[in-house]
Amino acid sequence: MNLVTVCGHNTTMLYHMLNHYHLHMDEIFVVLYAHHSKDPVIEEGLHILEKFNLQPHEIIVDEPFNWERVTEHYNRVKSLKPDDWWIVADDDELQLYSKPTWEIIDECEEFGYEFVTGGFVDRIGDNGDFPKITMESNVWKEMPEAGFFRYPMSKACPNKVTLMKGNVQVCSGQHYVQFEDGFTSWGSEHPKRYPIKKNFTQVHHFKWDYSVLERLRQVSKTKANVSFAQEYQLMYDEIEKSDFKIDLTKPEFMFQRIGNGNYHQLENWEKLRKKIVSI
């Protein structure tokens, strides 16, 4: 099993992301996505990769906040090993599975499934704050509140394709599989999809640290993707209304305090699964 990630804009979570996955991978492919040749993401990324005895698969200089381009890199890298299994994860996404991934892969091989899906669990700090994360942080404890606030606040798609064969193509944002006939894997069932009642991957999203507010402002001004710009502006506006905190008391956010990475502790996951696959 291989891992591919694209790291751009900042490296806040890259160390924690690699630390989460590296012991379980045969090979790790990191694409450093810089916005210019002097972008600090290059030097910072190289420094973090050294801690895992890794070299970047590629260093790319390209337009900032172009998620279609990012998805192209994911699909291209996976195609290097089309028959292998791959975890695809952004650098702020820590995936949790209902059982060891090798068991899921064995079942996929036996029954002909080619991809596994899941959805976002939004992580935030104590009292709904956006904490400062460093390499020394324990991110599960620094961001102990697990909920579902991004979609209610901005209508951002919460679906993710998390584990797949290398020849499986994903669409922008890695939200769904893109099939050759033009259709996607939207919905709760597909003959090539591992049954979601057996596993619906929790994608714990550690995007919401202290640096995200400035990033929301920057993306809202980008011309690379108007729909993403509008979504990020809406998210920023909603956060501003609540005094730059996330309201932990709102029932629709379904918050639960979980200071570790245990799939089976998230009490609302079945309820969330049904909601996410309907979006």
Where does each model-flagged region fall?
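Catalytic-site signature of metal-activated, phosphate-bearing donor transferases
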Residues: 67-73, 97-279
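Short, well-formed alpha-helical segments that are part of the catalytic scaffolds
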Residues: 10-24
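Mobile, glycine- and charge-enriched loop segments
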Residues: 1-6, 12-13, 71, 83-86
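Hydrophobic targeting segments
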Residues: 1-5, 20-21, 27-32
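Short, flexible loop/turn elements at secondary-structure junctions
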Residues: 5-10, 34, 93-95, 120-122, ...
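Active-site-proximal specificity loops/subdomain of glycosyltransferases
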Residues: 36-89, 96-97
